[in-house]
UniProtKB/Swiss-Prot annotation:
ATP binds at residues 120-126. PANTHER family: UDP-N-ACETYLMURAMATE--L-ALANINE LIGASE, UDP-N-ACETYLMURAMATE--L-ALANINE LIGASE-RELATED. It is found in: Cytoplasm. One of its GO terms (molecular function) is UDP-N-acetylmuramate-L-alanine ligase activity. The gene is murC. InterPro entries: Mur-like_cat_sf (IPR036565), Mur_ligase_C (IPR004101), Mur_ligase_C_dom_sf (IPR036615), Mur_ligase_cen (IPR013221), Mur_ligase_N (IPR000713), MurCDEF_pg_biosynth (IPR050061), UDP-N-AcMur_Ala_ligase_MurC (IPR005758). This is UDP-N-acetylmuramate--L-alanine ligase.
């Protein structure tokens, strides 16, 4: 019996208390459960857009962590980020209140629906949102939880009354294998989270289990442009796997005739899936996003729709309501024909994809790409130092801020200066400089930027708050400069 199957359990639970409710994953769980009728309360150390959204819904959000916060709770939900010395966690143990992980709660919520789980090193959030777009277009009204804010809904989760539950599945600590998926998506597999997995083989094994756990009537969708994914699925014969790609001619779903213009990608899709006797072409699919990586993300959504025999005409136009994900190549603003972009990219593969997209735009308008990168976690920089050194070669100027530690202690003898020096030694043509204080960013950028340039701010830390105000700051500096010139002339 699941939490959803027995509606009477809602009143028996008492309060579901969520520790760290402001996190992107936890806030989604909270919103879905609240809309299902559960009594939800949570706590977090800081307020953010997620906690404010939950408060507006009517959810009690407590500031800080305190043992008294769990009073009246019937269940406590925690994420992997919550340490065992957390006072609320300790109080729940003493009170013998059941403590379950976010992944376990997500699994329970998904169990009464047809569960579609999207995992992979990169592109999970966008892929999840694109699948939701097609399902909405087909009138299927799914329930959705993503790892980012969907711009068309201003939330990362919403409840639908249909049969499908579409959710991003976090692979960082192997909890994604707990999700009772009927359909599993793997976007790619990259060297990441080795602090948990210890080695790359263990990470690959977790993805294998993710597929093997599917029921006999389920199927996986996998990107075979990714060589690691390609090698993985070649060894799995006990589950149905639909493949997609751009470069791979053998993919069941393949995009070709790709064109980009004015923020849109258009392409044709060749279908060689199991349920088609002959090859089928969908022409002129339009995606309101740029970049090869986003086209690949859309192909995963198309693959699921095709396998479920959804209307091909609806599939073709299924992305028209896609408004993007917050911090995924988000245009913050413009000033003096200069564009400021904010992006969550914090892994070398993500950085390369983001820079490639910016480079395409800049080249068309004869501008430059000026990148500002905030490294995220000492452990990630140490683990992927060589990859970080080589991923910025297509920018014209690069500024690297101090490392956002995300709670880690500096035990790696690394700094942002280490990365700056390494990049300088490899790419003499790239202008690269450290930024010791992001408050100085507007003045630094203002002195360098020219019309038609793209200013690209990347990182998973607090660089986003600097990106949010940069256009206004640059505009203010421009006005001051113009006023100063006029005053001097007079």
């Amino acid at each position: 019996m699941t939490l959803l199957a027995n509606r009477r359990l809602k009143s028996n639970f008492g309060i579901v208390h969520i520790i760290g409710i402001g996190g992107i994953g936890m806030s989604g769980i909270a919103e879905i459960m609240y809309n299902l009728g559960y009594k939800i309360r949570g706590s977090d150390l800081t307020s953010n857009v997620n906690t404010e959204r939950l408060r507006l819904l009517g959810i009690e959000v407590l500031h800080g962590h305190n043992a008294n916060n769990i009073n009246g709770a019937g269940i406590v939900v925690i994420s992997s980020a919550i340490k065992h010395n957390n006072p609320e966690y300790q109080a729940a143990i003493l009170a013998k209140i059941p403590i379950i992980s976010r992944a376990e709660m997500l699994a329970e919520l998904m169990r009464s629906k047809v569960a579609i789980a999207i995992s992979g090193s990169h592109g999970k959030t966008t892929t999840t949102a694109l699948i939701a777009c097609i399902f909405e277009a087909c009138g299927l009204h799914p329930t959705v939880i993503t790892g980012g804010i969907m711009n068309n809904r201003a939330t990362n989760a919403y409840l639908g009354d249909g049969d499908y539950f579409i959710a991003e599945a976090d692979e960082s600590d192997a909890t994604f294998i707990k999700i009772p998926a009927t359909i599993a998506v793997i976007t790619n597999i990259d060297v990441e989270h080795l602090d948990f997995y210890k080695n790359f083989d263990n990470l690959i094994s977790a993805f294998r289990k993710f597929i093997i756990n599917l029921p006999y009537d389920g199927f996986a969708v996998a990107c075979i442009d990714d060589i690691t994914v390609q090698n993985l699925i070649a060894k799995i014969t006990s589950r149905k796997i639909i493949t997609y790609g751009i470069d791979s001619k053998n993919a069941h779903i393949q995009a070709f005739n790709i064109n980009t213009d004015n923020g849109y990608s258009t392409y044709d899709v060749r279908i060689k899936a199991y349920n088609f006797h002959n090859e089928v072409i969908i022409t002129q699919v339009t995606l309101p996003a740029l970049g090869k990586h986003n086209i690949l993300n859309s192909l995963a959504a198309i693959a699921i729709a095709v396998e479920l025999n959804l209307d091909l005409n609806i599939i073709k136009d299924g992305f028209k309501n896609f408004k993007g994900i917050a911090r995924r190549f988000t245009k913050i603003g413009e000033y003096n024909n200069i564009t400021v972009i904010d992006d969550y990219a914090h892994h070398p593969a993500e950085i390369i994809a983001t820079i490639d997209t910016a480079r395409c735009i800049a080249d068309k308008q004869q501008g430059r790409v000026i990148a500002v990168f905030q490294p995220h976690r000492y452990s990630r920089l140490k683990q992927l130092f060589s990859e970080f050194t080589h991923c910025f070669q297509r920018v014209d100027q690069l500024y690297i801020s101090q490392i956002y530690d995300a709670g880690e202690q500096e035990t790696y003898n690394l700094s942002h200066i280490s990365l700056v020096n390494a990049i300088k030694s490899y790419y003499h043509s790239v202008y690269v400089m450290p930024i010791n204080n992001l408050d100085d960013l507007p003045q630094i950028i203002y002195r360098q930027v020219k019309p038609c340039d793209i200013i690209l701010l990347m990182g998973a830390g607090d660089i986003t708050k600097f990106a949010a105000i940069l256009p206004q700051q640059l505009q203010k500096l421009l006005k001051q400069h113009v006023y100063s010139d006029i005053t001097t002339k007079n």
